[in-house]
């Protein structure tokens, strides 16, 4: 699809004349939006044909100087970005080294915790053994005390019976030996 645009505007015509400096143009220029090309139709004089103007299409045109400035600024930005990336890579390397050191420390701590866990388990076994032996000893002491308690009860019973006998003997003696 080509679009024909006439030079209705006087300002546009004078702009074209400034570009070419000399010459006249009457006719149309055609813009092809597919490839942003411009075609002319109409009559040109010889001088105008030699100094073909650049007609702006829907895109912007830049000069070589502007392009180089833009390119230089992009190069500078790219250099800054590359420097930042390099610095970040160095920081990442340092952090990786720190992480490696911390991993070694964590491994040592894990070994220490495992060793302490084993010591604790051994201590628990020893304490259980000690408690069991103490419990057995206490059971034996309890049995001994119960046996002694039974003996004391029997001795007490004997003493009570002896006390009763003594009382009866005293009463007999009192009866035999009346008041002197």
UniProtKB/Swiss-Prot annotation:
Q: What is the lineage of its organism?
A: Bacteria, Bacillati, Mycoplasmatota, Mycoplasmoidales, Mycoplasmoidaceae
A single Pfam family it belongs to is DUF16
Q: What is this protein called?
A: UPF0134 protein MPN_368
Record the organism. Mycoplasma pneumoniae (strain ATCC 29342 / M129 / Subtype 1)
Q: Which family does it belong to?
A: Belongs to the UPF0134 family.
Q: Tell me the InterPro entries matching this sequence.
A: DUF16
